[in-house]
C-alpha cells in the first residue's frame, strides 16, 4: 500500500490550488513552487556620478543657509554696509533674471504667460511694502530674548532644509512651508540688526537667496548641467570661504558635511544596492492600473 501511495503521488503533479484535494502533505513544497520568483525587477540601478550630481541640490541649500548666516553676521558686526549688500543683490538679481529667460529661450515665460511688466510691478510692490514695514520688523521681537531668537532661527532654518523640494516625490515636501520658515528665520535675525534699513535689506536678501536663487538653479540643472556643476562648486567654495573668515573649526566641519553628502553618501547608497532583495511573484497584491476616475464622479 505504501509503495502504491508513493507511485500515485509521483504520477500526480502538484497544482497551486486550494479548492482541490491533492495527495500531498500540508507542508509539501514542490520544485516548481518558486519558478515564478523574480528578484529586484523594479529596482533602480544607480550610477555613482549620477547620484553625486543629484546630491548637488542638497549642497546648494546648505550653502544658501551658510551664506545667509555669514552675511547676517557681517552686518551685525558692522563689517558689511547694507547699501553695498542691497546694490550687489540687486545687480545679481538682474543678471539672474536675464539668464533665467536666456537659458530656455523664453519658453518658460511663454508657457506661463507672465510679462516682464508684471514681474517689475511685483518687485516694486514687494520692495515698497518691505521697506515700509521694516520699522515694524525691527521692533517685532524686542520683547523676546536674543537667545530665544537665535534658537527659533536655528529651528526654522533646519525646517527649511527638511521641507525643501529637492526633487523627490514625498509627502514631507512642502515648498511653501520651507520658504515661509526661511523668511521667518530671516525676520527673527533681522530684528537683531542695528537699524531698520538693515532689517529691510536682510529680508530682501532672504527672498533672493531662498526663493529666486533655487529657481535659477533648477533651470540651470535642467538645461545646462555642466554650468550647473560649475556654479555649485563656486557657490560651495564661496560659502566655505565666508564661514572660514568667521570660524576655522566651523568651516572645517561644514566642508566635511558637504564632502559626506556629495561623495560618501552616494558611495554608501551604491554599496547598499548589493544587499537589495525585493522578491516578486504571483503572491503579490493585485495592482489596478486602469483609470477609475470616471467611477468616482
UniProtKB/Swiss-Prot annotation:
It is a multi-pass membrane protein. The chain crosses the membrane at residues 67-87, 88-108, 153-173, 239-259. It comes from the Eukaryota. One of its GO terms (biological process) is GPI anchor biosynthetic process. GO terms for cellular component: endoplasmic reticulum membrane; glycosylphosphatidylinositol-N-acetylglucosaminyltransferase (GPI-GnT) complex. The keyword Cytoplasm does not apply. InterPro entries: Plno_GlcNAc_GPI2. Pathway: Glycolipid biosynthesis; glycosylphosphatidylinositol-anchor biosynthesis. Part of the glycosylphosphatidylinositol-N-acetylglucosaminyltransferase (GPI-GnT) complex that catalyzes the transfer of N-acetylglucosamine from UDP-N-acetylglucosamine to phosphatidylinositol and participates in the first step of GPI biosynthesis. PANTHER family: PHOSPHATIDYLINOSITOL GLYCAN, CLASS C, PHOSPHATIDYLINOSITOL N-ACETYLGLUCOSAMINYLTRANSFERASE SUBUNIT C. Belongs to the PIGC family. Component of the glycosylphosphatidylinositol-N-acetylglucosaminyltransferase (GPI-GnT) complex composed at least by PIGA, PIGC, PIGH, PIGP, PIGQ, PIGY and DPM2. Interacts with PIGQ. Interacts with the heterodimer PIGA:PIGH. This is Phosphatidylinositol N-acetylglucosaminyltransferase subunit C. The gene is Pigc.
Amino acid at each position: 500500500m505504501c509503495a502504491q501511495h508513493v507511485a500515485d503521488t509521483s504520477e500526480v503533479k502538484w497544482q497551486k490550488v486550494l479548492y482541490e484535494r491533492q495527495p500531498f502533505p500540508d507542508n509539501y513544497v514542490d520544485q516548481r513552487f518558486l519558478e515564478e520568483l523574480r528578484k529586484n525587477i523594479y529596482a533602480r540601478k544607480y550610477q555613482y556620478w549620477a547620484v553625486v550630481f543629484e546630491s548637488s541640490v542638497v549642497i546648494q541649500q546648505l550653502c544658501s543657509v551658510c551664506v545667509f548666516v555669514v552675511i547676517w553676521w557681517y552686518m551685525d558686526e558692522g563689517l558689511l554696509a547694507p547699501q553695498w549688500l542691497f546694490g550687489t543683490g540687486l545687480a545679481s538679481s538682474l543678471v539672474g533674471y536675464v539668464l533665467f529667460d536666456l537659458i530656455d529661450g523664453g519658453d518658460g515665460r511663454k508657457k506661463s504667460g507672465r510679462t516682464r511688466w508684471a514681474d517689475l510691478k511685483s518687485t516694486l510692490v514687494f520692495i515698497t511694502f518691505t521697506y515700509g514695514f521694516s520699522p515694524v520688523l525691527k521692533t517685532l521681537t524686542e520683547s523676546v530674548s536674543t537667545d530665544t531668537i537665535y534658537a527659533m532661527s536655528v529651528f526654522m532654518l533646519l525646517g527649511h532644509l527638511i521641507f525643501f523640494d529637492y526633487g523627490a516625490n514625498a509627502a514631507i515636501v512642502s515648498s511653501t512651508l520651507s520658504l515661509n520658515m526661511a523668511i521667518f528665520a530671516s525676520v527673527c535675525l533681522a530684528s537683531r540688526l542695528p537699524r531698520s534699513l538693515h532689517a529691510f535689506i536682510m529680508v530682501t536678501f532672504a527672498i533672493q537667496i531662498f526663493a529666486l536663487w533655487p529657481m535659477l538653479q533648477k533651470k540651470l540643472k535642467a538645461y545646462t548641467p555642466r554650468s550647473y556643476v560649475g556654479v555649485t562648486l563656486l557657490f560651495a567654495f564661496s560659502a566655505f570661504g565666508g564661514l572660514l573668515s568667521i570660524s576655522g573649526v566651523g568651516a572645517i566641519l561644514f566642508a566635511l558635511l558637504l564632502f559626506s553628502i556629495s561623495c560618501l553618501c552616494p558611495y554608501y547608497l551604491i554599496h547598499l544596492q548589493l544587499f537589495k532583495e525585493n522578491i516578486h511573484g504571483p503572491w503579490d497584491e493585485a495592482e489596478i492600473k486602469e483609470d477609475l476616475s470616471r467611477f468616482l464622479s
